[in-house]
Amino acid sequence: MSESVPPTHTFTQIDDADLTGLNTLGLPARAQRLARPTTLDALSQVLAERNPAEPLFVIGEGSNLVICSDLPGLTLSLAIDGMSLVKQDNTHVWVAAGAGVHWDDLVAWTVEQGWQGLENLSLIPGTVGAAPFQNIGAYGVELSQLLEQVTVMDVVTAQVTHFAGNECEFAYRDSRFKSRDRGRYIITGIELRLNKMPQCNVSYGPLKARFGHLSQADILPAAVREHVIAVRQSKLPAPDVLANAGSFFKNPVVTKERGDALKRRFADLVAYTQPDGVKLAAGWLIEQAGWKGKRLGPVGMHSEQALVLVNHGNATSADVIALAEAVCADVQEKFGVALEQEPVLLP
């Protein structure tokens, strides 16, 4: 279903905008023009006044980006706000949120209402709009399991379209919006279906250790959220304290045969059986390759979580890319496994 949004509302635009504070790696960059539309009407107007031939970038809070140079053309940072209960039945609630909502604010609000589903995704940085783009996930839960629909705007026609969750082509840290339709749509909001009665997923690592002895009825979303936050804060640096883009590499998935072969060579290999093979813990691979806590110039892999690439100060995108390539090369040499970076490179 599509609908046109009339371009009637104004928007604020900044020329030659500094993006250093708008990417959590703290990389120096500027945008030729930066706009922050707060409504669908404002976004429609931004697109109507844009030259279709000029580059267009959407950056959210910049928590999953490596900005490699100044961005030409138009850069958007959506500020479409709002969280609401759409409908409910005896067992579920449907909630909506605008693309500009801080992701953890949405998680906190739903958990406060007693609704279950998002608690494992607590404290993931970024905005709601970025969540379906890369199908965020943590501790055994992915957004795709909870998402009912994504609302988008076509960058050319300004038409608003709603994609059902099963139309989004979700995969591990991927979606149609990140792959084949990248650049065609701007995500403006999402709708989720959550449980009224707790059915918390505590099958993953530290959650199983904390809650595994309890019955499902005794595991509350608020308690799971609290523990997830504690675990993340103990392992992951806050971007405002130590600049980073979260997990820098995806956990590679290999065939069962390859996983078994690695397990025979490395008895303490951290791996998880998947329908399509075996998922390896990239952080473990990086640590075993000698990169945990190791620096290369102003950047390095974090001392508590080897999966996180950090900027110790004054780093450039070239520094980041050089470190990522060095880590990948060493993991490939030691394990024969190729790592794939998670953040998007711009431009």
UniProtKB/Swiss-Prot annotation:
UniProt keyword annotations, A-Z: Cell cycle, Cell division, Cell shape, Cell wall biogenesis/degradation, Cytoplasm, FAD, Flavoprotein, NADP, Oxidoreductase, Peptidoglycan synthesis
PROSITE patterns recorded: FAD_PCMH (PS51387)
Gene3D superfamilies per the UniProt record, alphabetical: 3.30.465.10, UDP-N-acetylenolpyruvoylglucosamine reductase, C-terminal domain, Uridine Diphospho-n-acetylenolpyruvylglucosamine Reductase, domain 2
GO biological process: cell division; cell wall organization; peptidoglycan biosynthetic process; regulation of cell shape
Cofactor (UniProt): FAD
Active site residues per record: R173, S247, E342
Keyword GTP-binding attributed: no
Protein's UniProt name: UDP-N-acetylenolpyruvoylglucosamine reductase
Gene name linked to the record: murB
